[in-house]
């Protein structure tokens, strides 16, 4: 891969060239590099560092209209006004056929080439086994990784980082794009929230330090960043000098001009900066469509258009870097199989997950399809669950990131590799 550097010093040279090209920074020799990057040069090189981006669709996305089971007759009986039409030639107002049974919403058409190139996989009828229909509880369970257990204090992604310690870890190893650190990244391992790369504000886990990272460091009260404050200042200064406002996506990629597009573009900036980023979190809200959800057009369509264009732009922008990168989407639960009286859908159960990247065995819809006949539905109203979300995440963590202690990441869950969906190349 052209962008990957097999030796630490060459990796830093790439960073200098990148910043010179993209943001106008001028650095000469190792003396200009932050201390944590200097130590990374002296340490044993880690070629082909793997990275993971988690995108949370907050609000409970409608998986049945995102990945449409057009081969299921019951689908059209249940959704007379919001169902997505079956695929047909020459029309942009129908599901985009994936395999003769499933199709994606037409607003996700930019993702179809990635599916055909085996860079995108889908897991249907996936999610949390907990029966709650509460957004708050379901999100908490999905982020803690312990469905049904409210006493868990840390998040599964933080535990994953904690089980794979690095001697010379970057203060930017775990980053959330946004003003608050999500439940998923809270815990003992250092993690930061970055509202905007252009503003250079870093938020910590404690509300005491909401004034920004400088105030937090002065107070030294946050355990997640204690001992790494100076290095984080250096990393922030490095980004500031890089002038991220001048960033230009590569390969002709064009991100949508919205919160999700801006966040994924900044995720790309952080990855390309070679400052040790390993896991990143992005929130994407607005999926709770009880009223006037719409079908081919409408509220859901608008959200999916933004999502599809953003993910496609990110994939294009990353180029060869996608060989070491996986993006996974998740939502707290799905929606009811039947549309409601307001041409929307209500809180349901199972959903779909997207997994994108070079390590992905794409071009396939994974998971056992439970069916939509009345006797096949969960509680007579929802898509039934056949794949636990922890199996999907567990496979990504073990086969991509290299986490070996999945019992510590998902306590109480039997994450036997033989039960993995099989969507990541080991």
Regions flagged by a language model, labelled:
Residues 323:
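Active-site-proximal segment of RNA-dependent polymerases
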Residues 326-334:
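Acidic/histidine-rich, metal-coordinating catalytic segments
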Residues 2-320, 338, 352-359, 364-426:
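Feature for exported/extracytoplasmic and membrane-associated proteins, marking the mature portion
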Residues 347-348:
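Conserved active-site-proximal phosphate/metal-binding subdomains
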Residues 340-343:
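Histidine/acidic-residue-rich catalytic or RNA/ligand-binding cores of hydrolases
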């Amino acid at each position: 891969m052209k962008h990957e550097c097999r030796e630490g010093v060459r990796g830093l040279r790439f960073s200098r060239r990148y910043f010179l090209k993209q943001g106008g920074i001028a650095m000469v020799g190792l003396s200009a590099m932050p201390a944590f990057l200097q130590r990374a040069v002296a340490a044993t090189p880690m070629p082909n560092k793997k990275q993971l981006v988690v995108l949370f669709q907050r609000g409970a996305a409608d998986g049945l209209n995102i990945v449409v089971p057009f081969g299921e007759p019951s689908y059209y009986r249940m959704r007379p006004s919001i169902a997505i039409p079956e695929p047909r030639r020459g029309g942009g107002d129908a599901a985009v056929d994936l395999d003769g049974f499933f199709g994606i919403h037409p607003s996700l058409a930019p993702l179809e080439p990635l599916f055909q190139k085996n860079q995108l996989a889908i897991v249907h009828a996936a999610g949390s086994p907990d029966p709650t229909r509460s957004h708050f509880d379901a999100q908490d369970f999905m982020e803690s990784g312990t469905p049904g257990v409210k006493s868990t204090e840390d998040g599964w992604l933080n535990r994953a980082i904690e089980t794979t310690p690095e001697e010379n870890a970057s203060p930017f190893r775990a980053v959330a794009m946004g003003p608050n650190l999500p439940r998923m990244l809270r815990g003992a391992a250092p993690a930061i929230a970055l509202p905007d790369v252009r503003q250079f504000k870093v938020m910590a886990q404690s509300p005491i330090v909401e004034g920004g990272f400088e105030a937090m460091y002065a107070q030294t009260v946050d355990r997640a960043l204690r001992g790494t404050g100076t290095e984080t200042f250096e990393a922030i200064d490095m980004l500031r000098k890089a002038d991220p406002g001048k960033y230009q996506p590569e390969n002709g990629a064009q991100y949508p001009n919205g919160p999700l597009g801006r966040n994924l573009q900044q995720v790309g900036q952080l990855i390309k900066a070679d400052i040790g980023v390993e896991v990143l979190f992005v929130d994407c809200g607005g999926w709770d469509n009880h009223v006037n959800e719409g079908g081919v057009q409408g509220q859901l369509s608008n959200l999916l258009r933004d999502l599809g264009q953003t993910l496609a732009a990110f994939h294009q922008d990353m180029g060869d870097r996608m060989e070491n990168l996986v993006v996974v989407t998740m939502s707290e639960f799905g929606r009811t199989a039947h549309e409601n009286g307001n041409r929307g859908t209500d809180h349901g159960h199972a959903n779909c997950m997207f997994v994108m990247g070079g390590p992905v065995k794409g071009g396939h819809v994974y998971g056992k399809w439970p069916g939509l006949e009345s006797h096949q539905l969960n509680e007579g109203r929802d898509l039934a669950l056949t794949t636990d979300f922890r199996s999907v995440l567990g496979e990504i963590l073990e086969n991509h990131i290299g986490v070996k202690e999945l019992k510590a990441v998902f306590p109480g869950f039997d994450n036997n590799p033989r039960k993995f969906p099989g969507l990541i190349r080991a």
